[in-house]
């Protein structure tokens, strides 16, 4: 079984674990609809960067 030759310092241990964390989603408010949306994603109204890029069917079917 492998055994470390030297003790790993707290700094190196924490740097090793730096990617093992929960990340906060990048949520913003859409300027056209006022709803919350993920950054760099299209909103539910079909808008991206304040321009309509997708026609959304609002009939509810």
Swiss-Prot record:
GO terms for molecular function: structural constituent of ribosome. Pfam families: Ribosomal_L32p. It comes from the Bacteria. Keywords: Ribonucleoprotein, Ribosomal protein. GO terms for biological process: translation. Coiled coil: none annotated. One of its GO terms (cellular component) is large ribosomal subunit. Belongs to the bacterial ribosomal protein bL32 family. HAMAP family: Ribosomal_bL32 (MF_00340). This is Large ribosomal subunit protein bL32. It comes from Ehrlichia canis (strain Jake).
């Amino acid at each position: 079984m492998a055994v470390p030759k030297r003790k790993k310092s707290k700094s190196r241990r924490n740097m090793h674990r730096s990617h093992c964390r929960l990340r906060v989603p990048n949520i913003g408010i859409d300027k056209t609809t006022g709803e919350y949306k993920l950054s760099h994603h299209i909103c539910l109204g079909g808008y991206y960067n304040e321009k309509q890029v997708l026609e959304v069917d609002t009939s509810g079917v």
